[in-house]
UniProtKB/Swiss-Prot annotation, chain A:
Subcellular localization: Endoplasmic reticulum membrane
Protein name: Signal peptidase complex subunit 3B
Subunit structure: Component of the signal peptidase complex (SPC) composed of a catalytic subunit SEC11 and three accessory subunits SPCS1, SPCS2 and SPCS3. The complex induces a local thinning of the ER membrane which is used to measure the length of the signal peptide (SP) h-region of protein substrates. This ensures the selectivity of the complex towards h-regions shorter than 18-20 amino acids.
Organism listed in the record: Arabidopsis thaliana
Entry keyword annotation includes Glycoprotein: yes
Cellular component GO terms, alphabetical: signal peptidase complex
Cytoplasmic compartment spans: 1-11
Coiled coil segments of this chain: none
Length: 167, 180
């Protein structure tokens, strides 16, 4: 009952249990953080808008993205993954979500930013429904913790519209 | 030589009833582990409720050796979710993020494109020959939580199976020669 083996086993079990408990509490503490992120997206330019050889519409945009995601960071946050998606509906598809740009924000200091880029991923439709299409631009974020539960949320910005003709 | 004689004596002196008791206790431990695993499968609705990250394609968020807790609900798949999926013909699941979703009006079927955060291009190269989109039946679960470093135990045991055998052998020896 008092051999080295028993003592080592009891110590190890206790240590692992305490570690698991601490991880759970760290994750739980994330529920209490006050979060108020903000963002604005402007479409500066439609670079081109064409129908591809095999029939699908494709558009290239230049976006101006301003965001302040600093309030999302807690002591248990490893990084925040932010991305902008265009969301619209067509007659065939109830919902289309196309990610246009994403970024990994590793620290709170980098979470307040202003960036002007053309879309990182191609905005391609399934079909040719994009002329004159109204769509939303949504900034999504995914808070990845050092340990425990991950949180995700978004801000929806509506009122964007594609031109009526190809250019 | 005397040590060998002692071991042989101790093996000969094992009573059959004691041996059965020990075998049954071991069986109980293994079975309860299995019950917990199956219960987790039921609760999370996923075929494998816990997966180990094997590659660096989701760094710096998930490193090799981290474990992910999965959950699969009837909610529709949306962009930004981290999903675990199996490609037809491959048995190792892949954990990447959804970047494109096209959901059909009537049937609710969905076309999904994924990409690893740390990869340059999307996953079309990883899908089966001629496959452009993932469908719901490929997806095993969404990642909802994560623990760092714990998965290294599984990686070491899979890549160097000799360690697995040594561990099981040592455990077996301990069970046989322990006094209680």
């Amino acid at each position: 009952m008092h051999s080295f083996g028993y003592r080592a086993n009891a110590l190890l079990t206790f240590a692992v249990t305490i570690l698991a408990f601490i991880c759970a509490i760290a994750s739980f503490s994330d529920n209490f953080s006050n979060q108020n992120p903000s963002a604005q997206i402007q479409i500066l330019n439609i670079n081109w808008f064409q129908k591809q050889p095999h029939g699908n519409d494709e558009v290239s945009l230049t976006l101006n993205i301003t965001a302040d995601l600093q309030s999302l960071f807690t002591w248990n946050t490893k990084q925040v993954f932010a991305f902008v998606a265009a969301e619209y509906e067509t007659s065939k598809n109830a919902l289309n979500q196309v990610s246009l740009w994403d970024a990994i924000i590793p620290e709170k200091e980098h979470a307040k930013f202003w960036i002007q880029i053309s879309n990182k991923y191609r905005f391609i439709d399934q079909g040719h429904n994009l002329r004159g299409k109204d769509f939303n631009l949504t900034l999504h974020w995914h808070v990845m913790p050092k340990t425990g539960k991950m949180f995700a949320d978004k801000i929806v910005m509506s009122g964007y519209r594609l031109p009526n003709a190809y250019r | 030589m005397g040590w060998i004689g002692e071991t042989v004596d101790s093996i000969k002196s094992i009573q059959i009833r004691q041996l059965f008791t020990q075998a049954i206790s071991l069986g109980m431990i293994v079975t309860s582990a299995l019950i917990i695993w199956k219960a987790l499968m039921c609760v999370t609705g996923s075929e494998s409720p816990v997966v180990v990250v094997l590659s660096g394609s989701m760094e710096p968020g998930f490193k090799r050796g981290d474990i992910l807790f999965l959950h699969m609900s009837k909610d529709p798949v949306r962009a930004g979710e981290i999903v675990v999926f199996n490609v037809d013909g491959r048995d190792i699941p892949i954990v990447h993020r959804v970047i494109k979703v096209h959901e059909r009006e009537n049937t609710g079927e969905v076309d999904v494109l994924t990409k690893g955060d740390n990869n340059y291009g999307d996953d079309r190269l990883l899908y089966a020959e001629g496959q452009l989109w993932l469908h719901r039946h490929h997806i095993m679960g969404r990642a909802v939580g994560f623990l760092p470093y714990v998965g290294w135990v599984t990686i070491i045991m899979t890549e160097k199976p000799i360690i697995k055998y040594i561990l099981i052998g040592a455990l077996g020896l301990l069970v046989i020669t322990s006094k209680d």
